[in-house]
Amino acid sequence: MPPIVYPAAALTGAPRSRRIIAPRREGWSGVAIMEWELRAQQWVDTHPHDEINFVFEGTLLVESDGECVELSAGDSVLVPAGSTGCYRAPEYARMLAVYGPNPDGRPSAIEGLSPLP
C-alpha cells in the first residue's frame, strides 16, 4: 500500500486548530491528529477516546478527574477515554493532540472555549 499524504493546512477557527488526520464522524479505528493553539484561553470537553497532548511551545495546564498537571514544551499527557479534560493556557500554548480509536464515532461533549481573566 502506498503512503498517504495529508497536505498542510493553516491554523483556523476558535480555538485555532488544524486537522492533520481528521477524525471521521462515522468513527475511526486508528488515530486522529490535530494541532491546537490556545492564547490565554481554556477548552473543556469530555471525549469517548483516549487523548494524548504533546506541547510544542508555551505552558499548558491540563485538569482531569480532580488532578491538574502543568506541561511545558516537550511534555505530554494522556487524558483517558470517558474523562473530562480542561486544557488551559495561561498565556500561550501550541500542542499536538492524538486521539485514540473511536470505532463507534461517538461525539465528544464539548463545553467550549473561554478566555482567561
Predicted feature locations:
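Short hydrophobic/aromatic-rich beta-strand segments that constitute the beta-sheet cores
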Residues: 45, 62, 95-97
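Conserved strand-loop elements at the edges of beta-sheets that form or border functional pockets
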Residues: 46, 54, 73, 81, ...
